[in-house]
């Protein structure tokens, strides 16, 4: 067990800083990466109007992982041409927005957590020897689940976009935004809101309620560029002034926390330091990192 290895390495009387523990845990999981083949929690892949774009689902099929493609009633016929019926979860309504879809997945899942993964992820990688190396999907998701197994205050975790991996040296970043390939805690009474940048808003809701988020810096997703494929959010949420309105909605919910900027003719939320104000750390029945040190009992 990883806990026993850490305890043996540092000794019973060794005081260990919180971030040191998280890094050591990350190193142990990466060193034993091939062992993490169990993906315990259900996987949902929301998809809209692009039944033939099989990126995420191919990666999951190749790994022989079960999943549900979450679709709207108006798309059923198209998706049935590409997927067996048992892999389709048909929502009740059409064109209700991203928040409705994500909340539908959360309500449908009966486990403690569920995966919600965008449909345009080509493959999964790890950061290894300063390179992004493609790895089995099953192991990447399994390692992500294992990392939080001993904690009970995690609201959500996510993989990082592979393009950002070069800039991060640590295994994880605590209390940052989660997005695109996220493992969501179903036990929290927190819901996505449709009038804003939903992933940012959901992460902020988690943190303001005192829970933690974890962004994996060495477990990565190779995600297609926004707009590369028709359908999805490209033709709805981001169309026209949709991007600007969602950014303004985020400002409404979190006054003073986010600034809107325009880059390459598109509106964006500028990088914010708001995340730095959340100082809570992961904890569990035998682990509490909130005093910046950990003493094994």
Can you name each region flagged by the protein language model?
Residues 69, 113-118, 155-160, 213-217, ...:
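A structural signal for short, well-ordered beta-strand segments and their strand-loop junctions
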Residues 37-42, 60-69, 85-87:
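Short loop->beta transition adjacent to catalytic acidic/histidine clusters or analogous donor-positioning motifs
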Residues 72-115, 122-133:
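Active-site-proximal specificity loops/subdomain of glycosyltransferases
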Residues 13-42, 50-51, 194, 200-297:
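C-terminal catalytic/acceptor-binding lobe
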Residues 124-208:
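Conserved catalytic core of nucleotide-sugar-dependent glycosyltransferases
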Residues 50, 120-122, 162-165, 220-221:
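Short, solvent-exposed loop/turn segments at secondary-structure junctions
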């Amino acid at each position: 067990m990883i806990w026993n290895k850490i305890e043996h390495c540092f000794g019973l009387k060794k005081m260990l800083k919180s971030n040191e523990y998280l890094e050591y845990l990350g190193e142990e999981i990466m060193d034993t990466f091939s062992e993490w083949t169990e993906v315990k929690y259900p996987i949902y892949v929301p998809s809209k109007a692009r039944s033939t774009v099989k990126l995420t689902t191919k990666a999951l099929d190749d790994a022989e992982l079960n999943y549900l493609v979450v679709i709207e009633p108006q798309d059923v016929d198209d998706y049935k041409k590409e997927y067996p019926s048992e892999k389709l979860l048909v929502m009740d309504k059409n064109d209700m927005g991203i928040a409705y879809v994500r909340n539908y997945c959360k309500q449908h899942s009966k486990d403690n957590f569920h995966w919600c993964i965008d449909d345009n992820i080509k493959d999964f990688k790890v950061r290894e020897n300063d390179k992004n190396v493609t790895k089995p999907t099953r192991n990447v998701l399994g390692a992500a689940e294992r990392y939080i197994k001993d904690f009970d205050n995690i609201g959500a975790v996510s993989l990082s976009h592979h393009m950002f991996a070069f800039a991060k040296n640590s295994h994880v970043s605590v209390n940052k935004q989660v997005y695109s390939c996220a493992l969501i805690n179903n036990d929290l009474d927190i819901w996505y809101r449709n009038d804003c940048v939903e992933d940012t808003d959901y992460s902020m809701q988690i943190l303001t309620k005192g829970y933690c988020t974890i962004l994996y810096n060495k477990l990565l997703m190779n995600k297609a560029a926004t707009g590369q494929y028709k359908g999805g959010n490209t033709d709805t949420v981001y169309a026209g002034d949709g991007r600007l309105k969602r950014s303004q909605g985020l400002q409404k919910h979190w006054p003073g926390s986010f600034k809107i900027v325009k880059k390459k003719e598109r509106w964006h939320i500028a990088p914010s330091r708001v995340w730095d104000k959340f100082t809570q750390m992961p904890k569990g029945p035998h682990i509490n990192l909130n005093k910046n040190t950990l003493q094994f009992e």
